[in-house]
């Protein structure tokens, strides 16, 4: 029963400048950008190649979300840096230190699971299961520090990883524990 992860989202952050004038950025023609400082303190900007969305703050910090790989997140941030440099911001770091904050991945065990049995077998230490609040079982893996959402369909969502290997290891740990308890058939 071989399962692998599929990366669904990478959240990365960086600092592209000492500060940004978001009003000036809007006036300079950043096409499709949204900024309403009363509702949210950052400017929202989306690109399609590679697909990503950015939150741009006056502090010069940028959060990139929506990429399907670390490479795409990095490429999207470089794309943004070049765009900003060309339209409004001369003092942009074109080689920023990009840090992955979170990776969300999915996996499928390809078998139905009895979440009540899993919750009882695992005890209360690393597991939360309240089906009247949330349909999935929440399993917290200590190392690597990831959270695995387990659904009765056998589908999993793994979040909190800083690299794909964290998510792969989280999946391996869950599969091993389920297998050791005789829960995978």
From Swiss-Prot:
Belongs to the TBP family. Sequence repeats lie at residues 7-84, 100-178. Keywords: DNA-binding, Repeat, Transcription, Transcription regulation. The keyword Lipid biosynthesis does not apply. InterPro entries: TBP, TBP_CS, TBP_dom_sf. This is TATA-box-binding protein 3. The keyword Plastid does not apply. One of its GO terms (biological process) is DNA-templated transcription initiation. Gene3D superfamilies: TATA-Binding Protein. General factor that plays a role in the activation of archaeal genes transcribed by RNA polymerase. Binds specifically to the TATA box promoter element which lies close to the position of transcription initiation. Pfam families: TBP (PF00352). HAMAP family: TATA_bind_prot_arch. GO terms for molecular function: DNA binding; DNA-binding transcription factor activity.
